[in-house]
């Protein structure tokens, strides 16, 4: 295993020093694949294009992120930015590598969440686009473009994570494989407009299930805060260690998203617009308004205390699907005052 990790450091060093002109590209790619962006950007963008597809992306995102958290607790996995120092590798072998603000994530490293969660959540989008393209062209070369773009993007995400010292190559590979498999398995099984109790129980299961596993492992003598301690110890700058990269930050986001989706689908606002077909201009207006509300939510910041942050994060992501699914479309439809035919199944 030591040789595998050493090879990962050498690969990161090569990416940083042999291809310096690509630094901004890698930073941009890893930003695009940030799991938080699946919730805040990809979800509304896809939802306003296709309600069914948007809900699929959202559901798969928070289920896969929860599974990624559980996998990391059991698989552990060092991250390169701390392993290179903690193992003594940097003292024995001169190495020219440096960290970035997005390097210092606090959770265990295996498997890569960026690769796993993004790969799974974008799977139904890729399949839908592939089906649309296949229905409009007979060219086999054109038909493979969506799948090729999907694979190319995930490959770039994996390389960016190695470049940033956030993951070793084998962790990236594990994340890619898990993401594709979960996307394939979960896409046909996304629940659509179930009763509110179903979503409430889902949120409760995510929260209590992860908490039970955490305390069970803690009782058995496993210190699951080990990765937080190492990240804080070896990160070049303390301000790069962000609270929203902690494992329980993703748990509060996932459980809040599950509950929020259920509430959104059972609000009076959604009941009024669920069979309304929005025009392209209205969809664009919905997305712009949703992004404006997101900017406001981000402007609010978060409490400095860890426990209060988790509560705030839960409430924030409970509110977010209510805004995207119910309130924003209702506001746009009401203000535009346009009659629309019943929505087609999408």
UniProtKB/Swiss-Prot annotation:
Lumenal domain ranges by topology: 1-25, 78-115, 163-167, 219-254, 305-307
Active site: 114, 167
Matches recorded under InterPro entries: Glucose-6-phosphatase, P_Acid_Pase_2/haloperoxi_sf, P_Acid_Pase_2/haloperoxidase
Top-level taxon of the source organism: Eukaryota
Transmembrane stretches, start-end: 26-46, 57-77, 116-135, 141-162, 168-186, 198-218, 255-273, 284-304, 308-328
Gene3D superfamilies per record: Phosphatidic acid phosphatase type 2/haloperoxidase
Annotated substrate binding sites: 79, 161
Catalytic activity of the protein: D-glucose 6-phosphate + H2O = D-glucose + phosphate
Protein name per the record: Glucose-6-phosphatase 3
Organism from which the protein derives: Rattus norvegicus
């Amino acid at each position: 295993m030591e040789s595998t990790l050493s090879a990962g450091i050498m690969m990161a060093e090569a990416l940083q020093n042999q291809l310096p002109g690509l630094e901004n590209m890698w930073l941009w790619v890893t930003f695009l694949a940030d799991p938080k962006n699946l919730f805040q950007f990809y979800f509304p963008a896809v939802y306003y294009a296709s309600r069914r597809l948007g809900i699929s992306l959202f559901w798969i995102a928070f289920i896969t992120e929860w599974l990624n958290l559980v996998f990391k607790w059991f698989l552990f996995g060092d991250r390169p930015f701390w392993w290179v120092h903690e193992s003594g590798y940097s003292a024995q072998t001169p190495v020219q590598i440096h960290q970035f603000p997005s390097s210092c994530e606090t959770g265990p490293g295996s498997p890569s969440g960026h690769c796993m969660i993004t790969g799974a959540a974008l799977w139904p989008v890729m399949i839908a686009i592939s089906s649309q393209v296949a229905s409009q062209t007979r060219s086999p070369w054109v038909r493979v473009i969506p799948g090729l773009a999907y694979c190319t993007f995930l490959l770039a995400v994996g390389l960016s994570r190695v470049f940033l010292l956030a993951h070793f190559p084998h962790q990236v590979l594990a994340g890619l494989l898990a993401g594709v498999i979960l996307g394939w398995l979960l896409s046909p099984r996304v629940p659509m407009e179930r009763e509110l109790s179903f979503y409430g129980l889902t949120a409760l299961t995510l929260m209590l299930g992860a908490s039970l596993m955490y305390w069970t492992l803690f009782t058995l003598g496993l210190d699951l805060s080990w990765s937080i301690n190492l990240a804080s110890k070896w990160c070049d700058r303390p301000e790069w260690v962000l609270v929203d990269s902690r494992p329980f930050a993703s748990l509060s986001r996932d459980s809040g998203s599950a509950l929020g989706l259920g509430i959104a689908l059972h609000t009076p606002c959604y009941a009024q617009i669920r069979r309304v077909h929005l025009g392209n201009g209205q969809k664009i207006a919905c997305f712009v308004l949703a992004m404006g509300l997101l900017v406001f939510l981000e402007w609010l910041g978060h409490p400095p205390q860890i426990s209060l942050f988790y509560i705030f994060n839960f409430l924030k992501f409970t509110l977010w699907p209510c805004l995207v699914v119910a309130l924003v479309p209702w506001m746009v439809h009401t203000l535009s005052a346009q009659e629309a035919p019943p929505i087609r199944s999408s």
